[in-house]
Every structure is written in structure tokens, then in C-alpha cells.
């Protein structure tokens, strides 16, 4: 609870919110822990696909990611409720100090009541996890839950070969080593090449267009780029197999 001066007037002019703001800072730091947890789950899930390791539904990485996404949403709602309450009290400056805990709980519950599965579409980590998992499964010819697996009996190398065009950077025309994906249009590039291109354009006060032929995205920013872990793994796996076959 916020501390107060020795004055007994109860005026909000004497309320110190430093304690609450310090606690908020700690909560925001915990959000980074949740983010790290989601990165770990994503990495393990991709490992399982790459090694084609079966796990029971009890230990599903999808379920773990959903739980992290729920924690992230709940924590975000609580932080928002506290910040909203502090701002409201500072603006209204009521004569009598309100029950801050009660106000926060009301705002928090109001936010929680609006929860829906659609919220996960706004969680960047969750969306990235689903996309990368889907892409890696596609590279290996694995369908979700192995249902309606029309690729059974099809040579895995052929499936990967069909996707090899995705391995080439549209800028360097070479196979990518550190592919990054454009969140806005979905195209991928070699990280060093696209970063250099964007920086060069921005230094000349020009907009950077997606170098993929036919793409309509004409204002690329560094913040649009995310590591394409699924594609990186697929490229590495393909190269390992190619090396084994040549030996």
C-alpha cells in the first residue's frame, strides 16, 4: 500500500506512489521471465519436431505455450489495472483517499471478464510459435497431430527439395544462414543483407521496400524483422542430409 506523510488531512497531495511504482517495475521484470519461458518452450517444441520425437499430450508444448500466454495476459491486465488506478487518483485528487486495492481489483476483474482465445492472436510470441511450428512441420512433411497425413510414404528428401526455393535470400541469391522473417508480408531474407539494405535506405531518407519481387510492402522497418527459427533449422537439417549423402 502507498505510504503517507504524517499529515492527517488524507489529501492525495500527500500520497507517495513510489512503493507501488517500484512494485510495478518488478512485475514488468517478471514479464521478461515469461517471455524467456516462451522462448524456451518454442525451442523445445522445434527440437521435438526436428527429431520427430513423440510426447504425450500431458507434456504438450502447445499447452505449455498457452499457459505462458495466459500468465502474460493476466500479468498485463494487472499492471494495466494498477496504472489506470494510479492515474485516476492523481487526476481526480479526491479529498479522501480511496481503497486503492479495491479499485485495482475491480479494474482487473473487468479486464479479465473480457478474456477470449482471440487474445492469443495479439501475443507476438504465441503467434510466432504457432507459425514456426507449422512451417517446420511443413518442411518435414508432418501434419498437425499426424491426422490426414497424406504424405505418408512420400520421400522426405523430396518434400524438403520442394521447399528449397525458400532457402534462397532474395537479396544475395544465396542460401540463407541466419534467416529473418518480415512480420508484415511474411517474406524471409538473410539477416545481414536485409539489415544493411534497410539502414542504407534510411540513411538516404528513403523507404525500404521488400526485395521480394511482386511484394507490395514498401515501408520496411527493423522492428518488422523476427528470427525465422523454423527455416534456419530446416536449412541446417537439409545441409546435414546433403553432406551425409555425399560422403
UniProtKB/Swiss-Prot annotation:
Pathway involvement of the protein, from the record: Protein modification; protein sumoylation
Residues carrying Phosphoserine: 116
Renumbered zinc finger spans (SP-RING-type):
154-240
Q: Which domain of life is it from?
A: Eukaryota
In short, the EC number is 2.3.2.-
What Gene Ontology cellular component terms go with this record? Answer: chromosome, telomeric region; PML body; Smc5-Smc6 complex
- Which GO terms label this protein's molecular function in UniProt? SUMO transferase activity; ubiquitin-protein transferase activity; zinc ion binding
Sequence similarity:
Belongs to the NSE2 family.
Q: What is this protein called?
A: E3 SUMO-protein ligase NSE2
Q: Which organism is it from?
A: Mus musculus
Q: Which gene encodes it?
A: Nsmce2
